[in-house]
Amino acid sequence: MNNSKVIKLQDRVPKLKNQKKKNKKNVNHRLILYISILFLLVLFLIYFRSPLSNIKKISVFGNHYMTDEQVMKDSGVTYDTSYFRVTAHKAEENLTKRKEIKAVNVKKRFPNNIDIHIEEYLTIGYINKEGKLQPLLENGKTLDVLPNGKLPVAAPIFEPFKEEKMKELIAELEKLTPAILKSISEIRYSPTNANEDHLTLYMNEGYEVSTTIQNFAKRMEAYPLILKTIEPGKKVLIDLEVGAYTKELGAEEKKE
């Protein structure tokens, strides 16, 4: 037998011992890793079920007709809600059931913050009902009368009139630019023998406008341009019913 091929037992023992130590070390490392993962899972479960995971801050943006508290209640998101139980899509669905809300975007910000961004339907006017104002939205729906009479959004006030004519006017108001819409203080339906669609407008700039429901939005496009031609301090009537011109009011008319 070739002596070079003979491996003595004494030479193998240290190698076997080292291998056992290495294996034992690997087992210990894996055991520590598993215990650490288990510990983290236990901590997460405790945090998930404890008040520590509850929402700490809810920020609401874009709401005019609902208080922040109403938004939170209707969304289903409150300070007693766990951050991990909040489903943004569900909260958005809950809020879009409100007739004044056009769109909602709910964002979660780890670890405990919720942002609710609301887009309301445009307020195109307020219907005066026995001295109480009822918001009228661009989707044709009305809200409950305002409890304190304060206008959350600048828009014209008008008396209720024929439903058919109201619908026509609403369709025209939707076409107005925000700047012109905010300039209108009050709209009065004032039909004449010659024009059953006649309207009288009282503007925030102090002027009176005579116009009509038909092509109302198109006629009102001339209003900002006419304003630039009026001398300060003059009391004039702006006629947009046929063409576009101004008429200075006389002494008797000023008295009225």
Curated annotation (Swiss-Prot):
Q: Which InterPro entries match?
A: Cell_div_FtsQ/DivIB_C (IPR005548), DivIB (IPR026580), FtsQ_DivIB (IPR050487), POTRA (IPR034746), POTRA_FtsQ_type (IPR013685)
In terms of Gene3D superfamilies, this protein maps to: 3.40.50.10960, membrane protein fhac
Q: Which PROSITE patterns match?
A: POTRA
Give the keywords, sorted.
Cell cycle, Cell division, Cell membrane, Membrane, Transmembrane, Transmembrane helix
Q: What Pfam families does the record tag this protein with? A: FtsQ_DivIB_C, POTRA_1
Bilayer-crossing regions: 31-51
Bilayer topology reads: Single-pass type II membrane protein
Give GO terms for biological process.
Answer: FtsZ-dependent cytokinesis
Please list the coiled coil stretches. none
Q: Locate the POTRA domain: which residues? A: 53-121
Q: Which GO terms describe its cellular component?
A: cell division site; plasma membrane
Keyword Transmembrane assigned to the entry: answer is: yes
Q: Does the keyword Transmembrane apply?
A: yes
The listed locations are: Cell membrane
Ranges per topology, Extracellular: 52-256
Instruction: Show the PANTHER family listed in the entry.
Output: CELL DIVISION PROTEIN DIVIB, CELL DIVISION PROTEIN FTSQ
- HAMAP family documented for this protein: DivIB
Name the protein family.
Belongs to the FtsQ/DivIB family. DivIB subfamily.
Report the protein's function.
Cell division protein that may be involved in stabilizing or promoting the assembly of the division complex.
Q: What is this protein called?
A: Cell division protein DivIB
Species lineage, top-down? Bacteria, Bacillati, Bacillota, Bacilli, Bacillales
